[in-house]
Amino acid sequence: MTDKPKLHILLCAPRGFCAGVVRAIDAVEQALRLYGAPVYVRHEIVHNKFVVEGLKAKGAIFVEELDEVPDTDKPVIFSAHGVPKSIPAEAQSRNIFAIDATCPLVTKVHREAELHHNNGRQVLLVGHAGHPEVVGTLGQLPEGSILLVQTPGEIETLQVKDEKNLAYVTQTTLSVDDTRNMVEALTKRFPEIIGPHREDICYATTNRQEAVKRIAPIVDALLVVGSSNSSNSQRLREVAERSGCKLARLVLRADDVEWDLFSNISSLGITAGASAPEVLVEEIMAAFAERFELEVETVSTADEGVFFPLPRELRQAAS
């Protein structure tokens, strides 16, 4: 007999790593295998401190700007979030061996923005100021060519060059519902604005939010495993709250769980952001198993079979 209280855990599926994150992490690990340590990485390769520390232990050196990289023949890898065009240009001017691990779905947004600009349209970017992905997208075109909009209120007062010659793109890790509201506000204010042929919100962001929406109303609490600087992880927590979960928390490790808040629950949802490894979910599950008698159920809302090949330089070097 056990004197532990019972806890019904609902595991969201899909959760955790997406194809772009797997590609970026694999790029660093493959570069370390091919070229040896150190390998330099501009910005956190993905927004997860556990992943970054693990790569540091293998010989990766993380920098924020290229001026922190010494003259070297070792590769410098650009993170999954993408970079402004000035960064590859700076790397080329210094003869730096650069490997671009930008997620292909982010690159798609870059190319859309360029295409609209080349066709004479002013580009609006829906996103969060300061996020590396937004910085990278803004930096694809000459300064001032893209207008960043963050709220429907900003759209109401937005000054554009020509209301009949506009296009929009979006950050890939936003809330699906928030983005839908932004697009509705854009099309209401600017009826002739052109959008992407397919949604810019990435498949993994959409799928993880849909899984949270499914279980959030029926659990006492929900944990999102991820780093505080991860946009898609923060959006999962917000989606849980908006979907009716009264207690939603973002945690990186089991040590981050505020156990007093969870002492009287009988059901718990668990998901993980697209940059959070499954080992952290397992760690948190084990910590709950020490305190509760667990009954675990997986709630699946989508099947993911997406794969992105490594950057060309790494594929060629390995062949």
UniProtKB/Swiss-Prot annotation:
EC class of the enzyme, as a word? oxidoreductase
Which superkingdom heads the taxonomic lineage of this protein's source?
A: Bacteria
Q: What residues does (2E)-4-hydroxy-3-methylbut-2-enyl diphosphate bind to? A: 47, 81, 131, 172, 230-232, 275
Q: One GO BP annotation here? A: isopentenyl diphosphate biosynthetic process, methylerythritol 4-phosphate pathway
Q: Which reaction does it catalyse?
A: isopentenyl diphosphate + 2 oxidized [2Fe-2S]-[ferredoxin] + H2O = (2E)-4-hydroxy-3-methylbut-2-enyl diphosphate + 2 reduced [2Fe-2S]-[ferredoxin] + 2 H(+); dimethylallyl diphosphate + 2 oxidized [2Fe-2S]-[ferredoxin] + H2O = (2E)-4-hydroxy-3-methylbut-2-enyl diphosphate + 2 reduced [2Fe-2S]-[ferredoxin] + 2 H(+)
Cofactor list: [4Fe-4S] cluster
> Which residues does the annotation say bind [4Fe-4S] cluster?
18, 103, 202
What positions constitute the catalytic site? 133
Enzyme Commission designation = 1.17.7.4
* This protein's UniProt keywords: 4Fe-4S, Iron, Iron-sulfur, Isoprene biosynthesis, Metal-binding, Oxidoreductase
Which residues are involved in binding dimethylallyl diphosphate?
Answer: 47, 81, 131, 230-232, 275
Q: Which InterPro entries match?
A: LytB/IspH (IPR003451)
Sites where the protein binds isopentenyl diphosphate: 47, 81, 131, 230-232, 275
Check the record and name the HAMAP family matching this protein.
Answer: IspH
Instruction: Tell me the protein family, please.
Output: Belongs to the IspH family.
Q: Please report the name of this protein according to its UniProt entry.
A: 4-hydroxy-3-methylbut-2-enyl diphosphate reductase
